[in-house]
Amino acid sequence: MAFTLEDIVQRFGGEVVGDGSQRVGSLAPLDQAGPDQLAFLANPKYLAQVETTRAGAVLINADDLAKLASRENRNFIVTPNPYAYFARVAQTFIDLAAPKAAPGVHPSATIDPSAQIAASAVIGPHVTVEAGAVIGDNVRLDANVVIGRGTRIGAGSHLYPNVAVYHGCKLAERVIVHAGAVIGSDGFGFAPDFVGEGEARTGSWVKIPQVGGVSIAADVEIGANTTIDRGAMADTIIEECVKIDNLVQIGHNCKVGAYTVIAGCAGIAGSTTIGRHCMIGGAVGIAGHVTLADYVIVTAKSGVSKSLLKPGMYTSAFPAVNHADWNKSAALLRNIDKLRDRIKTLENAAAEKRDGPAPNAASKATGDKV
């Protein structure tokens, strides 16, 4: 299905510059778009591509439009945030193009008689829904999804294949969980019960039952193979509109504030609180029992071992450098204590040459008391 630029502006806002009757039916990058496609400019360093693109129209902001040498025979939708505008248009195109699954329960699904399934829900092959679970309106559960006893899945949510949501969890409206994610598995809680030291040590680790759940608010998206542990006593909490990438681990009792984004391979240890509107980079490790303020940014591969109580950007990772340069730096790090002592000795010698011996040193040399 194609839309005129005027149709798009009426739905999403903005201003058409050029031919409002131009029709576009899909989206593409500036350097690949054709006459029936819509492209966007989000980064001004690609401004030159706007001059050469074959796109039927370009989403652009007013400042970048003013920089163009020519607008002849080109069409634009002017909007303050072309990237977000692109995302909304793309959602519409995808929703219209996607095949619509018919509501109902696949014959191979296993549904406990006490579970409540909305008539508009789509329950795919080999799905399991346990006792007391509630599946809301327009929910889609793809193949092999498992919903534990007493768990509630809010209206409009979509769980992709092989997602497992353990017992006693709550997912609000429009939650998206991608394939292989696990929600509500046991938190990593074990009490040490050992006696003695070394080879004489005896005893074991005692498992602490994890009796909390996981509570996920509306419009959260969770990436593939991500795991969110259930709380030890109270729920692990993910607030509204949080976006979590693939392969992220969130430990028990954590709280992730609204509108925070967490990139792939991040690991967040138990009982950590992350504020609202935070950005956690890929492969970041956050220790347990720490707090991050609202509007904190932690760059990729950083390690957070203590609370960050002020908004801002934090980094602790080493950027990649030439291998030989890294080896030289590593050698210096191994000898940093010796270098510090040598510098201190040289500083003391320079001060003594400039100012004379310190009073303590002079009195000790003559045997006088200070």
From Swiss-Prot:
* Annotated catalysed reactions: a UDP-3-O-[(3R)-3-hydroxyacyl]-alpha-D-glucosamine + a (3R)-hydroxyacyl-[ACP] = a UDP-2-N,3-O-bis[(3R)-3-hydroxyacyl]-alpha-D-glucosamine + holo-[ACP] + H(+)
GO biological-process terms attached to the record: lipid A biosynthetic process
Looking at the UniProt entry, the stretches that span the membrane are none
- Note the superkingdom of the native organism: Bacteria
Q: Name one GO molecular function term.
A: N-acyltransferase activity
Q: Write down any Gene Ontology CC term.
A: membrane
What keywords are assigned to this protein?
Acyltransferase, Lipid A biosynthesis, Lipid biosynthesis, Lipid metabolism, Repeat, Transferase
Q: What Enzyme Commission number(s) appear in the record?
A: 2.3.1.191
Enzyme active site: 252
Assembly with partners or alone: Homotrimer.
What is this protein's function? Catalyzes the N-acylation of UDP-3-O-acylglucosamine using 3-hydroxyacyl-ACP as the acyl donor. Is involved in the biosynthesis of lipid A, a phosphorylated glycolipid that anchors the lipopolysaccharide to the outer membrane of the cell.
For this entry, the protein name equals UDP-3-O-acylglucosamine N-acyltransferase
**Protein's organism:** Paraburkholderia phytofirmans (strain DSM 17436 / LMG 22146 / PsJN)
What lineage is on file? Bacteria, Pseudomonadati, Pseudomonadota, Betaproteobacteria, Burkholderiales
